[in-house]
UniProtKB/Swiss-Prot annotation:
Residues 93-122 form a coiled coil. Disulfide bonds: none annotated. This is Mediator of RNA polymerase II transcription subunit 22. One of its GO terms (molecular function) is transcription coregulator activity. It comes from the Eukaryota. Its main location: nucleus. PANTHER family: MEDIATOR OF RNA POLYMERASE II TRANSCRIPTION SUBUNIT 22. It is found in: Nucleus. It holds the Pfam family Med22. The lineage of its organism: Eukaryota, Metazoa, Chordata, Craniata, Vertebrata. Belongs to the Mediator complex subunit 22 family. Residues 166-200 are annotated as: Disordered. It comes from Homo sapiens. GO terms for biological process: positive regulation of transcription elongation by RNA polymerase II; positive regulation of transcription initiation by RNA polymerase II; RNA polymerase II preinitiation complex assembly. Keywords: Activator, Coiled coil, Nucleus, Transcription, Transcription regulation.
Amino acid sequence: MAQQRALPQSKETLLQSYNKRLKDDIKSIMDNFTEIIKTAKIEDETQVSRATQGEQDNYEMHVRAANIVRAGESLMKLVSDLKQFLILNDFPSVNEAIDQRNQQLRTLQEECDRKLITLRDEISIDLYELEEEYYSSSSSLCEANDLPLCEAYGRLDLDTDSADGLSAPLLASPEPSAGPLQVAAPAHSHAGGPGPTEHA
């Protein structure tokens, strides 16, 4: 049986083998069940004692019950094989299922795209309103200071530079303890001779 399954088989041959297995298993169940019913019937006196006949009937019932169980397991295996056959070979159904799934995914994608577009528009509107509010508040602050913000920062930089320039000569001036400043006398040229000497 394993060698037959290993051989390459066409679909028709495989289906025929499934059909034969189904008929054989059902026939086995029916025959064994019928024989069990017949064995349960009380017969007339025979040459065999009743005790021996009872043991023989008991053993026969066990064997036929095992045959019924074996046929049932074979039917369950047949159902599993049929499912596998349909999954692997029923290409139209598989393609239809794939198409339905693709359609569902496309619908879901379109819905997500619509929601994202709506969310983008709402965020754009909110961002525009926030920018207007921000720039209007900034312009009101500049008008309150009578200067634009850029000019205020520029004037602040100029004041800082001028303060640094004034501090440099103050650092170079002499200390008060150095004494009085000496004033140089202007030189006068006298043609007639030396004049009076000026004392500082």
